[in-house]
Amino acid sequence: MSDRVKITPMTLNFGPQHPAAHGVMRLVLEMGGEVIERIDPHIGLLHRGTEKLIEYKTYLQALPYFDRLDYVSPMCQEHAYSLCVEKLLKCEIPIRAKYLRVIFCELTRILNHLLNISSQALDIGAMTPLLWMFEEREKILGFYERASGARFHSAYIRPGGVAADVPDDLIDDIFKFIKTFPKFIDDVDELLTENRIWKQRNVDIGIVSKEQALDWGFSGPMLRACGIPWDLRKSQPYEIYEDLEFEIPIGKKGDCYDRYLVRMAEIRQSIKLLEQCLNRLPNGPIKTDDRKIAPPKRSEMKESMEALIHHFKLYSEGYSVPIGETYMAVEAPKGEFGVYIVSDGTNKPYRCRIRAPGFAHLQAIDMMAKGHMLADLTAIIGSLDIVFGEIDR
């Protein structure tokens, strides 16, 4: 009689209520013992019909929907939408507004990567980074609140500029924060990067080759971890990125460990970008002077009838956008976040298509996890950096 144990294939449901699923994700796993043979992701549990809802809102009213897509890094999505509308309007925004946008987008990148690295570590069993990193995230959310009045859904970056100017003491506090923050990142680096257990759980897990990454439509840290130095801030510069100096961190193998290293390096590059922006931040207006697009100041409305009419018309009817269609993408923390708008010349978008980076990454999970152990699946999901607000839309 053979000593070999006959393993019967088993179907396993992972999620939709599971702490390592990073939201409402259901995976149907076909297991051969403890080895994954096939993964079938079921998405759509957080579908809210965002793209359709936008068609019934004015261009300004549609903005808050973008905060609620990838709710971990909201400002980058507002940015993509605002750039898209501005392109259709052929609207130029003041240089100070461009600097403020880049400052908050880079703070958002740090915010996103802190959450991803800490939750990836927690999924694998390291609890300390989560407690450390959430303390730093709170500081950045405090900057959000002081600039816009909201910690998460800020609606700060708007077509025509930014919602409001930042107080001088906020700029000073961000500067103080980025002076002490690199020391904190060094501590996290020391805690995780060469940690034996961390490396055992991440090295050679979920390997993706350059060819596979391009075939699946990867972008952001997922693509750069495979060794492809593609970053929209360099390849298709927008705002003031072409005037700033920074490097594109890339990986070698394209495994979970490389994805972690790329995100850690990106945090350091964001600090470098923030330092340059804060040192160069010019004075001046923060909105376009076209009162059909950006509202007038409150003080103007008390004296000028035209300003009051502009304000009323902007917040009741909105502005009409010329007929046309355009696509605009930004380098969001998770990858290429794109917005495609078709305008029919009215005050509402005829069609708004959203390109979420997480969707392309999640569809490749079967290819990444096949042949791995069930325990490795949490490491792979953690390294994907998925948020279901943007995937399900």
From Swiss-Prot:
<keyword id="KW-1003">Cell membrane</keyword>
<keyword id="KW-0520">NAD</keyword>
<comment type="similarity">
    <text>Belongs to the complex I 49 kDa subunit family.</text>
</comment>
<dbReference type="GO" id="GO:0005886">
    <property type="term" value="C:plasma membrane"/>
</dbReference>
<dbReference type="Pfam" id="PF00346">
    <property type="entry name" value="Complex1_49kDa"/>
</dbReference>
<keyword id="KW-0813">Transport</keyword>
<dbReference type="GO" id="GO:0051287">
    <property type="term" value="F:NAD binding"/>
</dbReference>
<protein>
    <recommendedName>
        <fullName>NADH-quinone oxidoreductase subunit D</fullName>
        <ecNumber>7.1.1.-</ecNumber>
    </recommendedName>
</protein>
<dbReference type="InterPro" id="IPR014029">
    <property type="entry name" value="NADH_UbQ_OxRdtase_49kDa_CS"/>
</dbReference>
<keyword id="KW-0997">Cell inner membrane</keyword>
<keyword id="KW-0874">Quinone</keyword>
<comment type="subunit">
    <text>NDH-1 is composed of 14 different subunits. Subunits NuoB, C, D, E, F, and G constitute the peripheral sector of the complex.</text>
</comment>
<dbReference type="GO" id="GO:0050136">
    <property type="term" value="F:NADH:ubiquinone reductase (non-electrogenic) activity"/>
</dbReference>
<dbReference type="InterPro" id="IPR001135">
    <property type="entry name" value="NADH_Q_OxRdtase_suD"/>
</dbReference>
<keyword id="KW-0472">Membrane</keyword>
<dbReference type="InterPro" id="IPR022885">
    <property type="entry name" value="NDH1_su_D/H"/>
</dbReference>
<keyword id="KW-1278">Translocase</keyword>
<keyword id="KW-0830">Ubiquinone</keyword>
<comment type="function">
    <text>NDH-1 shuttles electrons from NADH, via FMN and iron-sulfur (Fe-S) centers, to quinones in the respiratory chain. The immediate electron acceptor for the enzyme in this species is believed to be ubiquinone. Couples the redox reaction to proton translocation (for every two electrons transferred, four hydrogen ions are translocated across the cytoplasmic membrane), and thus conserves the redox energy in a proton gradient.</text>
</comment>
<dbReference type="InterPro" id="IPR029014">
    <property type="entry name" value="NiFe-Hase_large"/>
</dbReference>
<dbReference type="GO" id="GO:0048038">
    <property type="term" value="F:quinone binding"/>
</dbReference>
